[in-house]
Regions:
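Bacterial N-terminal signal peptides that target proteins for export
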Residues: 1-11
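C-terminal motif of bacterial Sec signal peptides marking the signal peptidase cleavage site
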Residues: 19-21
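Bacterial signal peptide processing site
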Residues: 23-25
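Solvent-exposed loop/turn tips at the surfaces of repeat/solenoid architectures
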Residues: 36-37, 57, 209
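Short solvent-exposed capping/turn motifs at the termini of beta-strands
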Residues: 39-41
Length: 242
């Protein structure tokens, strides 16, 4: 009987602690509540008069605004007459293509609902400072993934003379592997192959990328066919050069 009494006391204490913790969690304010907003997404019908609860960067609940009483949030936003959509992606961006627009691009993306971007070609010395700015604490900017420079052949199309400087030369397989090592060390998320690459350099890039677990985007090199290139890459950025 003594053992049963002890167990009952322990269970009672445990339950009391759980209830206390739940009460404290319920009272804890969330980060953001957006009220009276119209939701549009790719799966559901248009939903009006909704309250969206967000905490630690995640949506934790979507409820009817008529039932959203006593919501405790650090920030409350009235979305009456406004629309809320999932963040959009721009999968093909060149932040450093024209320096006149570089500084304004992040704000324009967010204004139009783009919250994630992939920069598909830029010299590291130009692009990395932009990435640092976009990722700095408090920056109002989309999340960015980048390839670094266009991996071109012995001749570079975007050479900074005839066109903006976005690409680098890869005259040999050895040069390509060395360039990829530098690009990978600079934090690139994927690689971008360009049009003047020869088949032997292309093969070296694919091999090195697989070794480093780096996805490949690319144009179809002028010396190759799309049917030969497509199985080796994760994305063909332009449907040409067949």
């Amino acid at each position: 009987m003594i053992m049963v009494s002890v167990i009952r006391s322990a269970l009672t204490l445990s339950l009391a602690l759980v209830l206390t913790a739940c009460s404290q969690d319920t009272a804890k304010p969330i980060d953001l509540a957006i009220h009276n907003v119209t939701l549009i997404d790719a799966v559901n019908p248009i939903r009006t008069n909704r309250t969206v609860l967000i905490d630690q960067g995640r949506i934790i609940a979507i409820i009817n605004s008529d039932a959203a009483h006593d919501i405790t949030a650090a920030q409350q936003v009235d979305g009456s007459g406004q629309y809320l959509i999932p963040g959009l992606w721009d999968f093909h961006v060149h932040f450093t293509f024209d320096a006149r627009f570089t500084d304004s691009m992040a704000g324009l993306f967010l204004y139009h609902g783009v919250t994630n971007v992939r920069d598909t070609g830029g010299l590291l010395e130009d692009l990395l400072p932009v990435v640092d700015t976009l990722r700095s604490a408090g920056a109002k900017a989309p999340s960015i993934w980048y390839s670094g420079p266009l991996l071109d052949g012995a001749d570079v199309v975007y050479d900074g003379v005839n066109f903006p400087g976005l690409g680098i030369a890869n005259p040999t397989p050895e040069a390509a592997r060395a360039n990829i090592a530098e690009i990978h060390a600079a934090g690139a998320s994927f690689l971008k192959i360009y049009e003047m690459v020869t088949p032997d350099v292309f093969a070296a890039i694919v091999d090195e990328a697989r070794t480093r677990n780096l996805p490949i985007d690319g144009h179809v090199p002028l010396s190759m066919r799309a049917r030969d290139v497509a199985p080796q890459v994760q994305s063909l950025e332009h449907l040409r050069n067949y």
